Amino acid sequence: GPSQPTYPGNDAPVEDLRFYYDNLQQYRLNVFRHRY
């Protein structure tokens, strides 16, 4: 399955943080969907 995205850190640029949160949302949706 999808691997959990790694947090880029508080010093990361906004684009990286936005990318991380987008991936995290997709990851959670995938995990939630596969669990049931």
UniProtKB/Swiss-Prot annotation:
List keywords of the entry alphabetically. Amidation, Hormone, Secreted
**GO cellular component terms listed in the entry, alphabetical order:** extracellular region
Subcellular location(s) of the protein: Secreted
Cited PROSITE patterns: PANCREATIC_HORMONE_1 (PS00265), PANCREATIC_HORMONE_2 (PS50276)
One annotated GO molecular function is: hormone activity
Tell me the residues on which Tyrosine amide occurs. 36
Checking InterPro entries in the record gives: Pancreatic_hormone-like (IPR001955), Pancreatic_hormone-like_CS (IPR020392)
Instruction: Say yes or no: keyword Nucleotide-binding present.
Output: no
Q: Which family does it belong to?
A: Belongs to the NPY family.
Q: What does this protein do?
A: Hormone secreted by pancreatic cells that acts as a regulator of pancreatic and gastrointestinal functions.
Q: What is this protein called?
A: Pancreatic polypeptide
Organism encoding this protein? Anser anser anser (Western greylag goose)
Designated gene of the protein: PPY
